[in-house]
Amino acid sequence: MNDSEFHRLADTLWLTIEERLDNWDGDSDIDCEINGGVLTLSFENGSKIIINRQEPLHQVWLATKQGGYHFDLKGDEWICDRSGATFWDLLEQAATQQAGEAVSFR
């Protein structure tokens, strides 16, 4: 994967998250902000989830209250380089915990 392809895939990931939150109809308020390639989700309780891209490594990084995760693209899924979990699974687990209600991005 070259840099431009990586950025296209990361942009698609960011857009998917933003669109899902725009359509969010849960009781919790989840704000989404993108600034300089960093996507920040802010929750009512003051907690945050930070998602950023690491261009030199062609990775997406996810920082949550539970910890930090690094994802490599394998096939058509972003996969955690330590646990093998998918990006969507870990994001949904963290967002659900931080929002206090079930959050789905799929």
From Swiss-Prot:
CDD domains recorded for this chain? Frataxin
GO terms for cellular component: cytosol
| Family annotation (InterPro entries) | CyaY (IPR047584), Frataxin/CyaY (IPR002908), Frataxin/CyaY_sf (IPR036524), Frataxin_CS (IPR020895)
Keyword field contains Metal-binding = yes
Question: Single GO molecular-function term?
Answer: ferrous iron binding
Q: Which GO terms describe its biological process?
A: iron-sulfur cluster assembly
Q: Which UniProt keywords apply?
A: Iron, Metal-binding
Q: Which Pfam families does the UniProt record give?
A: Frataxin_Cyay (PF01491)
Q: Which HAMAP family match?
A: CyaY
Q: Tell me, what does this protein do in biology?
A: Involved in iron-sulfur (Fe-S) cluster assembly. May act as a regulator of Fe-S biogenesis.
The UniProt entry's sequence similarity note says: Belongs to the frataxin family.
Name of the featured protein: Iron-sulfur cluster assembly protein CyaY
Q: Which organism is it from?
A: Salmonella arizonae (strain ATCC BAA-731 / CDC346-86 / RSK2980)
